[in-house]
UniProtKB/Swiss-Prot annotation:
InterPro entries, per the entry: PSI_PsaA/B, PSI_PsaA/B_CS, PSI_PsaA/B_sf, PSI_PsaB
Primary residence: plastid
Keyword terms of this UniProt record: 4Fe-4S, Chlorophyll, Chloroplast, Chromophore, Electron transport, Iron, Iron-sulfur, Magnesium, Membrane, Metal-binding, Oxidoreductase, Photosynthesis, Photosystem I, Plastid, Thylakoid, Transmembrane, Transmembrane helix, Transport
Family recorded in the similarity comment: Belongs to the PsaA/PsaB family.
Any one GO molecular-function label of the UniProt entry: chlorophyll binding
Name of the protein this chain belongs to: Photosystem I P700 chlorophyll a apoprotein A2
Broad enzyme group: oxidoreductase
Membrane disposition: Multi-pass membrane protein
Organism from which the protein derives: Morus indica
Annotated binding of chlorophyll a B1, by residue: H654
Residues reported in the UniProt entry to bind chlorophyll a B3: M662, Y670
Binding site residues for phylloquinone: W671
Swiss-Prot/TrEMBL catalytic activity: reduced [plastocyanin] + hnu + oxidized [2Fe-2S]-[ferredoxin] = oxidized [plastocyanin] + reduced [2Fe-2S]-[ferredoxin]
UniProt-annotated binding residues for [4Fe-4S] cluster: C559, C568
Amino acid sequence: MALRFPRFSQGLAQDPTTRRIWFGIATAHDFESHDDITEERLYQNIFASHFGQLAIIFLWTSGNLFHVAWQGNFEAWVQDPLHVRPIAHAIWDPHFGQPAVEAFTRGGALGPVNIAYSGVYQWWYTIGLRTNGDLYNGALFLLFISAISLIAGWLHLQPKWKPSVSWFKNAESRLNHHLSGLFGVSSLAWTGHLVHVAIPGSRGEYVRWNNFLDVLPHPQGLGPLFTGQWNLYAQNPDSSSHLFGNSQGAGTAILTLLGGFHPQTQSLWLTDIAHHHLAIAFIFLIAGHMYRTNFGIGHSIKNLLEAHIPPGGRLGRGHKGLYDTINNSIHFQLGLALASLGVITSLVAQHMYSLPAYAFIAQDFTTQAALYTHHQYIAGFIMTGAFAHGAIFFIRDYNPEQNEDNVLARMLDHKEAIISHLSWASLFLGFHTLGLYVHNDVMLAFGTPEKQILIEPIFAQWIQSAHGKTSYGFDVLLSSTNGPAFNAGRSIWLPGWLNAINENSNSLFLTIGPGDFLVHHAIALGLHTTTLILVKGALDARGSKLMPDKKDFGYSFPCDGPGRGGTCDISAWDAFYLAVFWMLNTIGWVTFYWHWKHITLWQGNVSQFNESSTYLMGWLRDYLWLNSSQLINGYNPFGMNSLSVWAWMFLFGHLVWATGFMFLISWRGYWQELIETLAWAHERTPLANLIRWRDKPVALSIVQARLVGLAHFSVGYIFTYAAFLIASTSGKFG
């Protein structure tokens, strides 16, 4: 008999039912569970797959460049970034009638096109690209890098080039190379690109390979570097009347500390950005020389950890045993990496709009909204993944003997206290926030809006004032003109920063009031509840009060009836599954808040947000209902318009989302009976019964159905909001 799918598990391959297919897909990437796996092969497979991942990323970015160069309007956009709409790619659709062709032919294109809301035009423009030829060159280069990555992945699967386990577990060498090589050298290289290509480009000078060695990035060349007069590189910066991409008002400085934004582009000064990357490079190049490898100098991480024993023995044996625990657990390492990456992705969402780095992106409102929402959702999925792999670590890799009385064991010892405190915080936030909102709703409904409970966020306003925002009247730190903090920065970055923070045309430290106070606490409720579910899932992964022996049941055991007191909703997977719903809800509140506040700011009617955001009906009526009118008008009796695709996606998103409930609120027996009936009918229907299948059809398991339901819920939720966000923003601001 030929080998059946899945080849990596002979046990599953023998399964006579359709379970074989679903379980095979589910465990395809769980290398640890495959037949004949060894620790060495596990590490080698993961390592090789990283190169495949890189190849896909480079191919994808190459495709972005290629399609914009081929079908976009980059050169026209460069001439007038504020009024030309950037084109992502052409649309070829045989179903388009004349009205659709007319609706989607825009941005100076000859046929139907998609508008780009990703910010790539602004990014490419800022870093010095100017022509379609530049874009094609970039696409070809990335295609080449993609091919190199694929070859490297294949190479590292060949016996001669397979690294050993000891190589993968050499933590110090890996840290040194990643810190110095990945962050240090790449930041230094990026500084070089900004100084040699992007900054001259912003001043109207076109630097390419043919004149790269002839154009001095700074009139004095490397002289100031070698004579120690580094301040010369900061002298004569671009003036406030500088036109980006033009020599008019341009200076000669390359590394500055101006603070604030370029008045025309509303983005950070390019010379400040170059300075920042140089500083990052310097720090990481040093950091990558700190750990002990073959040369016998520097820190040994194991020694560092074992020296960490708090005084008075208040944390037991401190960090003893942690080095081997972490170094021998891929799931622990992945959990740490995902947690870090999740936080950084959320920070990217925050900083892309509050401190925009790319020229003119701040004036492209739809792109700002899309990028913020995109990065917050990505961050949510990555962060929940961190806890999932933390739970798998406890089940598969945690050894109580190795970690006796250290900080990890003590976390498990007092998990009840951690979980109950989180529970209390979530309940407190939930009841109080909902109570305030509902009280305000009732007051509005009874026509007495003056009886609302409106709380000024004075602590947050004080923090904003400390950073230099003067409108609240707190005379503190940077908003006080006679303090030491103010005087220290007065000659360098402070004037630019204070100008930016007190100007109303950007998103830096937005003015906040009672509506912000309430939604902030609603978001805090979501964050704490999501964290509660995730933390409980990880800390109870090996055993809980109800079921102290979860280790041999694994990560995703299903509901198993009341025999052992019931195992429903107590596997680590169940906690992850529930947490994702909370994560999506929380990010829903975050993005609603961000978007509503910003559209009222951009439209100049910020009082609408301030007045309507203090009660739930305000959110439902003045944000969701009011802004979905464009969507509902994508198709109307007069034909269609360019929002019709978003109107369709809005409907389709709701459909996918609602389909999720068919899998979530259901009984397995019902589906099994339905399947048996369908199979019976099929076998007795002429013609149809010529088609046979080898596997007996069985209903999805409880865990599988939940996964399918969760996937539909998530995808539908995100599709629906993406369509709403893009249509309502682009419908208002063109």
